[in-house]
Amino acid sequence: AEGGVRVGFCGRFPGGERGLWNRDDLFSVCIRIPREVKGIGKRFCARPFPSTLILSPPGGGKTTLLRDMVRTLSDGGMRVGLCDERGEIAALSAGSCGFDIGERTDVLSDCPKARAAMILLRCMSPELIAMDEISEPEDAGACRSAAYCGVSLLATAHAADAEELSRRDVYQRLLRGKVFFRAIVIRCA
């Protein structure tokens, strides 16, 4: 959605190719309004930057921290490639970002993360590739491919801690392959 706002719907799934919701089919709506909190990621952004995975349950602030770390690293001189599949990190609209993501950040928005990572890697010469919510095998595969091409990674995943993460199939190859060297766990009170 515009400005990085996320809207979730629940109720009777409409199905079909277009998946249009009828107001009579809705049971609940969740509106998540993003915010920019500058400075929260600074302490995690020392150089050289180790590939880092940010963990928390849904709604824990992963995207907010990711956005600030991207900005901090980019303004600190690092070339960053940002895979913004759902348009919620940079909030790109008409060629302008709705959030400050740094001077040296190239954004690929509304493109599947796995494809965006490979395009950024081949075309934009990043030192760091950042993406939100690794959840599909294709996302994990893109992380592995990028990590073995000499770039650092910054990504998020839904998990309460590293142990919980390690129990999920999609992350096991990432952990075994030592794709990420550090995890930042956001504890929700």
Predicted segments with their positions:
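P-loop NTPase switch/communication element
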Residues: 74-118
